[in-house]
């Protein structure tokens, strides 16, 4: 019942049972908040069960990194979810009828899961109302004590103007997410009037 454009950019992780799995982003043209959990049997064998292998994951359609935290006993990720309020927005040209979910990257959220299948949005890290020209994407990160340090491929206005679109990054940005386990950080809200 799913419509896929592609599966790509998997993240290898050890599941709660101690087995190696690949959590793969899925470009599902309808929702874009879906990922696939593929089991690694050995060096030459992976398996996927369509009845149980899909998981609802905020931002599962865009590249993400998942890491396990021994302190909280949870898996964590930074992702770009697809909010309904953004899905219906329009702009000139490419986005004259709507913005496709694969391009919604203006909100970066911290998510957690105890089992890699059930994901919860903990808190927004960055939230911009400009889904056409702002993008905080392809984020890679590490734990740093009680914080997360992250690098984002970012599309954002600068002295030469706007980036071509949110996917076409014009800078790399560094972020520190303070006290991530307790969501002790402040969301960076960006309101951009020149849409």
How would you describe each model-predicted region?
Residues 8-11, 62-65, 137-140:
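Beta-propeller and closely related beta-sheet repeat lectin domains
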Residues 1-5, 9, 13-58, 68-132, ...:
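Beta-rich carbohydrate-recognition and catalytic domains
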């Amino acid at each position: 019942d799913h419509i896929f454009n592609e599966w790509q950019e998997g993240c290898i992780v050890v599941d709660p049972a101690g087995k190696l799995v690949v959590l793969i982003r899925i470009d599902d043209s309808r929702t874009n908040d879906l990922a696939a959990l593929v089991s690694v049997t050995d060096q030459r064998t992976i398996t996927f069960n369509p009845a149980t292998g899909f998981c609802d994951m905020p931002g599962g359609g865009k590249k993400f990194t998942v890491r396990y935290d021994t302190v909280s006993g949870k898996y964590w990720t930074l992702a770009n979810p697809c909010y309904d309020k953004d899905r219906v927005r329009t702009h000139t040209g490419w986005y004259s009828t709507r913005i496709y979910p694969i391009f919604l990257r203006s909100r970066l959220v911290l998510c957690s899961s105890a089992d890699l299948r059930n994901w919860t949005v903990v808190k927004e890290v960055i939230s911009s109302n400009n889904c056409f020209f702002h993008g905080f994407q392809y984020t890679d990160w590490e734990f740093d004590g009680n914080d997360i340090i992250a690098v984002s491929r970012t599309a954002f206005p600068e002295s030469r103007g706007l980036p071509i679109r949110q996917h076409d990054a014009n800078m790399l940005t560094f972020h520190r997410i303070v006290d991530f386990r307790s969501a002790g950080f402040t969301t960076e809200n960006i309101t951009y009037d020149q849409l």
